[in-house]
Swiss-Prot record:
Sequence segments annotated as region (A): 1-339
InterPro entries hit by this protein: HATPase_C_sf, Heat_shock_protein_90_CS, HSP90_C, Hsp90_fam, Hsp90_N, Ribosomal_Su5_D2-typ_SF
Subcellular location(s) per record: Cytoplasm
Listed name of the protein: Chaperone protein HtpG
Chief location: cytoplasm
GO MF annotation: an example: unfolded protein binding
Source organism: Burkholderia mallei (strain ATCC 23344)
Length: 632
């Protein structure tokens, strides 16, 4: 049998049904698609009229008109663009996935393509009208053809259509949607305006509707003869920065972010190269109430050639920058056929990287401001979004160092809970012999400030960062060093604050040897509660403290995981005792109440670091017994 090449067969009725009811997730999209087609028709006329001005037919003011008829249950979209001939109507409307725009675009020269702002590329947008209509009537005449060569195209979306030649004086296209049952809510001026303003507000053509006014006698809105433009018909981001005032940027932010307050900062630029796009990004001055909700949708508004595609385009910004508001307008982003989903590609990745770098540059300018007003702005930003930005240390490996420079913490340098210390500030204040950046984590600033682990640091004048945000422990698992200086927890491992002289070293060794019987007996008494017991010289005022081994999870992180309902490995801390404290000095390994004192020192250390006692009743009973024995 000889090999044959065959064409796939398609049941057109089924294909139309599948496309109409499966391609689009939101029925409002039909108006965006039809307005986009009308905009393309105007652009085509402009280009052809460059060589033949007579195509304007004494009507050079291009526009789109939107109207509805409640009695007839129809919505009409009318444009005075290029229009279609009979053959074009049959080819473009009668062939699924044929794009007249795409074919027209392919005929343009390179320079003309760069200047064109044509939107359609799939040839399926027209059929979105069948989402809300059970019949569509199109009347059209191509510019330059006589009125006798008008065309009427009509279909019920069932796999066939009818075409007639009609008399049509007006150039352009009129699309009438005969609505399905249950779609009457669209027969409202307010409803249609809201859809246009959501999706097509920045289409270059004015979109006109008849004005409505309240009629007191009839008790309803009545249509007037006067037209009104219902879209902005311009996109602020397409203008040069020098042409836009600060007040206009602020007003646009309030419009796009639905926020009544001014932004802290903004950045506006056009990127040219393999991926061409314009970005206008804003930093809000306050966090939305639902920023930490599981369902919070962050991201930018995505436009393609000034037509709104989607809110919350999460693919264009990493999660830790979800608070950034603004728009990205691209001319060549890959979308799926319904233009509702952004497809992953090298272009999307390049735009994401570019937008991320631009957003970080904007934050760096805020953070590095020298004037008081600029510093105050960054304080406001950090208070609102600092915890979110910390997520970037773990999420964005490529920009980790840039994000780290933007971080701010409270520290022992100032006696306030203000998070205003940058890591660079800390490094600049380090002692000559200091090799590490020290920090302590706790539930609250008060608990961190009063942690017994800080005692020796205060004595030696070494600054310690006070970390109290829930994200800090997770962040530190990714941030191991800054400017070549390792970050070290004051509550983990052995403490090394610099070299000791021979006399100090000998004294500590002798003290440790003398305390060995007590330490061994404490290990035996506390058993599984502790991983080890050892003498420490990090304490000056407290009798004991708990530390984690170098490779173990900290007690604070374990408590945080439990509070979040997650499983955490069992925590065995190391109990360190201060040999110079009177309570420790009074311990005798053979004393009758030695066990009670051991448990009391452990429980006190646990409470001091913000932990919770497993058996509070026993702690109270033991404490009372020891107090009574001392009183006696």
């Amino acid at each position: 049998m000889t090999q044959q090449t065959m064409s796939f067969q398609a049941e057109v009725k089924q294909l139309l049904h599948l496309m109409i009811h499966s391609l689009y997730s939101n029925k409002e999209i039909f108006l965006r698609e039809l307005v986009s087609n009308a905009s393309d028709a105007a652009d085509k006329l402009r280009f052809e009229a460059l060589e033949n001005n007579a195509l304007y037919e004494s009507d050079p003011n291009l526009r789109i008109r939107l109207s509805f008829d409640k009695a007839a249950r129809t919505i009409t979209i009318d444009d005075n663009g290029i229009g279609m001939s009979r053959d074009e109507a049959i080819a473009n409307l009668g062939t699924i996935a044929r794009s007249g725009t795409k074919e027209f675009f392919s005929k343009l020269s390179g320079d003309q393509q760069k200047d064109a702002a044509l939107i359609g590329q799939f040839g399926v947008g027209f059929y979105s009208g069948f989402i809300v209509a059970d019949r569509i009537t199109v009347e059209t005449r191509r510019a330059g053809l006589p009125a006798s060569e008008g065309v009427r195209w009509e279909s019920a979306g069932e796999g066939d259509f009818q075409v007639d030649t009609i008399e049509r004086a007006a150039r352009g296209t009129t699309i009438t949607l005969h609505l399905r049952e249950g779609e009457d809510e669209l027969l409202s001026s307010y409803r249609l305006k809201s859809i246009v303003q959501k999706y097509s507000d920045h289409v270059a053509l004015p979109i006109l509707m008849k004005k409505e006014e309240w009629d007191q006698e009839k008790g309803e809105m009545v249509e007037k003869d006067e037209d009104e433009t219902i879209n902005q018909a311009s996109a602020l981001w397409t203008r040069a920065k020098s042409e836009v005032t600060d007040e206009q940027y602020k007003q646009f932010y309030q419009h796009v972010a639905h926020d009544h307050q001014d932004p802290l900062a903004w950045t506006h630029n056009r990127v040219e190269g393999r991926s061409e796009y314009t970005q206008l990004l804003f930093v809000p001055s306050h966090a939305p109430f639902d920023l930490w909700n599981r369902d919070y949708r962050g991201g930018l508004k995505l436009y393609v050639k000034r037509v709104f595609i989607m809110d919350d385009a999460e693919q264009l910004l990493p999660q830790y920058l979800r608070f950034i508001k603004g728009v990205v307008d691209s001319s060549d982003l890959p979308l799926n056929v319904s233009r509702e989903i952004l497809q992953e590609s090298r272009d999307v990745k390049a735009i994401r990287e570019g937008v991320t770098k631009r957003a970080l540059s904007m934050l760096e300018e805020l953070a590095n401001a020298e004037d008081d007003a600029g510093k105050e702005k960054y304080k406001t930003f950090w208070s609102a979004f600092g915890q979110v930005l910390k997520e970037g240390v773990g999420e964005d490996h490529a920009n980790r160092e840039r994000v780290a420079k933007l971080l701010r913490f409270a520290s022992t340098h100032g006696d306030t809970d203000a998070q205003d210390v940058a890591l660079a500030d800390y490094v600049a204040r380090m002692k000559p012999e200091q090799t590490k950046i020290y920090y302590v984590t706790a539930d609250t600033w008060q608990a961190a400030k009063n942690s017994p682990h800080l005692e020796v640091f205060r004595k030696k004048g070494v600054e310690v960062l006070l970390l109290t945000d829930r994200v800090d422990e997770w962040m530190l698992s990714f941030l191991h060093e800054f400017d070549g200086k390792p970050l070290a927890s004051v509550a983990r491992g052995d403490l090394d604050l610099g070299a000791l002289n021979d006399d100090e070293k000998k004294a500590q060794e002798e003290t440790g040897e003398a305390m060995k019987p007590v330490v061994d007996k404490m290990k035996e008494t506390l058993g599984e509660k502790v991983k080890d017991v050892r003498v420490t010289f990090r304490l000056t005022d407290s009798p004991s403290c708990l530390v984690a081994d170098d490779n173990d999870m900290s007690g604070y992180l374990q408590r945080m995981l439990k509070a979040a309902g997650q499983s955490a490995p069992s925590f065995q801390p190391i109990l360190e005792i201060n040999p110079e404290h009177p309570l420790v000095k009074a311990l005798k390994a053979d004393g009758a109440d030695f066990g009670d004192w051991c448990h009391l020192l452990f429980d006190q250390a646990l409470l001091a670091e913000g932990g919770a006692l497993e058996d509070p009743a026993s702690f109270v009973k033991r404490t009372n017994a020891l107090l009574l024995s001392r009183a006696a």
